[in-house]
Each structure stands twice: as C-alpha cells, then as structure tokens.
Amino acid sequence: MSKAPLFEKISVKGTLFPIEVSMKRLHLSHPYTCNGQEFSSLPMYDTSGLHGDCRTQVDPHVGLPPLRSSWNFPRTVQLGVAQTQMHYARKGVITPEMEYVAIRENQQLEEWIRSFNRHGKKVEPITPEFVRQEIAAGRAIIPANLKHPELEPMIIGRHFRVKINSNIGNSAMGSSIEEEVEKAVWSCRWGADTVMDLSTGANIHQTREWILRNSPVPIGTVPVYQALEKAGGKAENLTWELYRDTLIEQAEQGVDYFTIHAGILQEHLPYAERRLTGIVSRGGSIMATWCRHHQQENFLYTHFNDICEILKSYDIAVSLGDALRPGSILDANDEAQFGELKVLGELTKQAWQHEVQVMIEGPGHVPLNLIEENMQKELELCYEAPFYTLGPLITDIAAGYDHINSAIGGALLASLGCSMLCYVTPKEHLGLPDRNDVREGVIAHKVAAHGADIARGNPTAWLRDTLMSQARYSFAWEDQFNLSLDPEKTRAVHSQSIAASGYSAPNPDFCTMCGPDFCSMKRTQKMGKGN
C-alpha cells in the first residue's frame, strides 16, 4: 500500500456561492490532543494555488485557470460605475469573495476557534457577514480586480491574519521576464500573500502580463514607474494624461492594487530637504522632481478623483504610498512623514466617497521606541484603514541582514495592529534579489507575521504552535519539520547535523545541541514516568 502524502491539497465548498476554497492539509505522524480536541491532521492556509499542487503541472505560457469566472456573481467593467467590494458591502450585499476569505481565514478550524480561550478572551469564527462589515467600515480590503479571474481572494485588515507582501521586478541592470515570473510563483510557494511587480527595466507590460496570468495572489504595482519609462525616464516629462493611460493599461491587465504617491505635496518638500537621507521612495522622488520642476502641485493629488473613477470601475484597491517614509532612523517620525500621513487620511476619505478600497503604506526606518507612535498616528489620521508597512527596519547598519532587521520591526508593528508587512530581503540596499533572497525574505516576514498573530490571539496560529511544542516534546521529527515555516530547511539542517555527529539512527530522541545525555525534555519525561 502506498503511503499517503504528508501534505495534500484540499478544497472547501462555500454555502452561499459555488466556490471552492483552496487549502492544504498536513497529515501528522500521530494524533495530538489540544483543549480536549484530537488532531491527526491540520488544515493550513495556503498561498501557492495550483503551483503547490503536485497533481497539477501549470504551463506558465498558458497560466492558471480563471477561478472566479464561474462564481455566478457577474460584474463587468463600466467606466465610472462602482463595482467594488466596498460598494456591495455598504449595500449589505455579501460577495463570493467575502465568503471565500471567511472560509480561508477559519482554516476549517471553527470548533477549535470556539473553544479557544487565552487570557479570558473568547473568539468566534469569522463569518462572511463580519467580513462585509469590516469592508464597509474601511477597516479591511479584498484586492481583487475584475480582470484577474485567476486570483484566490484574500483579505487585509487588522482583525484578520497578518499578511505579507513580496516585491519582485526587473531593473535596468538585469533580470528577464521568465526570472520574474519564477520569482512570483516562488514567492507564492513560500507564503507571500500578495506580490508587487516593481519592474523598472525593459518589457514592463509583458512581464506584468505573465506574472498576472500565473498568480493566485493579488498583484500590486507602482504605475508611475511605467509612466516614467513612457516619458523617456525624465520625471519632468510626466503628464496626467500619460499617467491616466498607464493606469487604464494596467487595470485592463488585471492589477489588483496600485501604489499611488498622491500624498506628497509641495509644502512637504522643504521638510524632506532638511533630512539626513532626503526622499528614499522611488515614486516619491519622481513626483517631488516633477513638482519642483513645474512649480505645481502633485498631479496625482489634484487628479485623485479622476484616479478613483478608474479604480472603482475595475475594483482596484489603492495603496496610498508613503513617498516621505524615513530612510534612516534619524528621520523617523518627522514633520515630513507625519505631514504626508495626514494628507493620506484626507485621501482615504476621498477614496471612500467613491467606494474605493484603501490601505495606507508606512515606513521605513524607525527605531523600536518610535514604532508604536506610527500605529497610533495611522489609526487616528487614516480612520483605521489597513496599515501596510515596509518593515520598519529598526537600525541602519544591518546590510546583508536587513530581512532580519525588517522582521523585528514588522513583528512589533503588526502586534500593535499593522495588517500587512512588505518583505525585505538580504539584498536590501545592496542589489536586485534572486530567488534565494526572495525565499529568505518571505520566511523571515512569515515569522514576524505569525509572531504577531500569536500576540493578537489568533486561535489558528496558537494551534500550530501548540502542535509544534507537542511534536518537539515527543521527538516527532517529521511533524516538527512539517509544522515549521520552512520544512525543507529544517529537515536538511537536522539531517546534516545528525550525519555529522556520526549517529546512525535518522531521528533519535535528542538533537545534537544537547546529545543523548543532556536533553532536558528527555529527562523531564523520565521524571514524569517515575524514573
């Protein structure tokens, strides 16, 4: 008899719509008991789509099947007509995407969620109605362009799992379309909840098309990068019309959210010029250059209503870019940063008038003692719209290890309410990341996000840790490997360590850190048995 796979792809049917929510199930080596419930397997949140299904071979030239096309909730693009999740949420209508993300967040663990009680805090499973309420209030978003049917919907908001974003994209210095598609798929395999294509080199349109057709997660872009390419690389040659046409081009391809640097105004530039590191946002520096050259207000700000007319037609979310994020800890929480944040709050209200979904981008480089103020200011000035941050990095001297630097700051900020962390790789400040850097960056930020979920009392996160602790205490090595965020690495490290020690058994009841005679857990078990 062939052995069942340890991981298998499963799908959970909806009750309101003909949807099937993709997850994976881990089969454990033996049952574990938690809070009186027995677990012989664990359903797990999965971002890999069909790319993670060993039974399916995805041809990148064909792409993924159009999952959402058969959901019996027809919406077509009509310019100027709101088609957004917020539009339906405010009308009291639950969409297929809302039911999908509710099922996905619960991970088939409703019984466990109801029984979970940590420090007197009771939790209920997430319902489609709760999702609708959070979207209607602007506290959560489901980025899902009508033109991206391959997408498996996900939700970003502080009452849901902390998400992470992976940045990919070519530059003028190298990388091909195939490499960037591979990085996008690779990101999804390791747990990226969204991917941003930040291509600035050749073939931007073609690269994005390939990525979208192969992506089960939302794809974001910074449209001003492509607009700048069309303007010959000169910021002063940008026009509203050129930018508008770029927005529509990317919207038609299926981009799910746009980073738009509409909050940097002429009045902010003197503050930025007094900084140690000035403006470190690429999009921010482009728009600052345009404003200074033309001595005019940022056209993304003056045309923001026009932008929203486009976004609401496709159900594209706006990620209000932090053009003035601090690029050094000395510049953190200064007048430039918080001045822009106030404008982002005003733009949030403006977007909501168009029923456009909004999230707010945040820093940046921020020392640990100033991180909490960032969360407080964002909630206050931006009306609790989801916060999406780059780290923050807590020191300026971690080059080569900035993924760890960022994950430390991100864990703290997410524990305080940040909704999504943008990953940083070991190549940050040094060069264009390759696929191994992408993996390192994703895993580091999955650690941060999961740690924040623990701090926020997420029952599904607590269950995974509890099972890991039980597996560790019982020396169930395969379960330990598979419950970790990177099973391949943990298995390889353990195997190499055992082999180097000369021990013959592959999975002994100790590790090489302590050896057979100094293992504290082994001794404790003997104490419990009366030995």
UniProtKB/Swiss-Prot annotation:
Q: EC annotation?
A: 4.1.99.17
One family from Pfam that matches here is ThiC_Rad_SAM
Q: Which residues bind [4Fe-4S] cluster?
A: C511, C514, C519
**UniProt cross-references to InterPro entries, sorted A to Z:** ThiC, ThiC-associated_dom, ThiC/Bza_core_dom, ThiC/BzaA/B
The Gene Ontology biological process terms listed for this entry are: thiamine biosynthetic process; thiamine diphosphate biosynthetic process
Keyword line: 4Fe-4S, Iron, Iron-sulfur, Lyase, Metal-binding, S-adenosyl-L-methionine, Thiamine biosynthesis, Zinc
Q: Which cofactor(s) are needed, names only?
A: [4Fe-4S] cluster
The record's remark on the cofactor is:
Binds 1 [4Fe-4S] cluster per subunit. The cluster is coordinated with 3 cysteines and an exchangeable S-adenosyl-L-methionine.
Tell me which residues bind Zn(2+). Answer: H365, H429
Answer whether the UniProt record assigns the keyword GTP-binding to this protein: no
Annotated Gene Ontology cellular component terms:
cytosol
What molecular function does GO assign, one term?
zinc ion binding
Q: Does the keyword Transcription apply?
A: no
Give the catalysed reaction(s), semicolon-separated. Answer: 5-amino-1-(5-phospho-beta-D-ribosyl)imidazole + S-adenosyl-L-methionine = 4-amino-2-methyl-5-(phosphooxymethyl)pyrimidine + CO + 5'-deoxyadenosine + formate + L-methionine + 3 H(+)
| UniProt-annotated binding residues for substrate | N167, M196, Y225, H261, S281, R282, G283, D322, A323, L324, R325, E361, Y388
Under PANTHER family, the record lists: PHOSPHOMETHYLPYRIMIDINE SYNTHASE, CHLOROPLASTIC, THIAMINE BIOSYNTHESIS PROTEIN THIC
State the HAMAP family in the record: ThiC
Q: What role does this protein play? A: Catalyzes the synthesis of the hydroxymethylpyrimidine phosphate (HMP-P) moiety of thiamine from aminoimidazole ribotide (AIR) in a radical S-adenosyl-L-methionine (SAM)-dependent reaction.
Q: Which family does it belong to?
A: Belongs to the ThiC family.
Protein name (database record)? Phosphomethylpyrimidine synthase
Tell me what gene encodes this: thiC
